[in-house]
């Protein structure tokens, strides 16, 4: 049996509530996660640890209150979900980080094993240009 819209929404509540740890409990340690684009967060991550270090850890340095992700909509079929997310956060320099995402998420036994994430590359590039990190 595949996943349901309700189960996906429940998993993503962690991100919506600012509790990344709760969300990442549902992500496989060896997740295959591609963040598309040509910006500082883009890349092909082959583990949960690498993904967190390459994205969320960097974002936490420039977004004091986190990315503040919220699910706008989702489509579910079998073990796949397409999740539309919206981030409306404020950067250290006051920039409104108003970004939209589309994550294509693949599940195995209720655990996220693969993700393809699409987002506004120019917005991410601007965020890091105006808020450089070490």
Residues covered by each model-derived region:
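Residue-level signal for the nucleotide or nucleotide-sugar donor/cofactor binding architecture
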Residues: 3, 18, 46
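A solvent-exposed, acidic/Ser-Thr-rich amphipathic alpha-helical stretch
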Residues: 29-77
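Short, well-ordered alpha-helical segments enriched in acidic and aromatic residues
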Residues: 18-34
């Amino acid at each position: 049996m595949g996943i349901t819209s309700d189960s996906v929404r429940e998993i993503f509540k962690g991100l919506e509530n600012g509790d990344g740890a709760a969300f990442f409990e549902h992500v496989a340690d060896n997740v295959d996660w591609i963040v598309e684009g040509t910006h500082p967060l883009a890349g092909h991550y082959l583990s949960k640890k690498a993904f967190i270090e390459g994205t969320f850890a960097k974002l936490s340095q420039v977004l004091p209150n986190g990315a503040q992700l919220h699910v706008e909509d989702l489509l579910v079929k079998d073990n796949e979900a397409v999740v539309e997310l919206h981030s409306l956060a404020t950067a250290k320099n006051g920039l409104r980080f108003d970004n939209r995402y589309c994550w294509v998420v693949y599940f195995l036994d209720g655990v996220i094993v693969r993700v393809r994430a699409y987002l506004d590359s120019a917005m991410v590039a601007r965020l890091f240009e105006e808020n450089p990190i070490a």
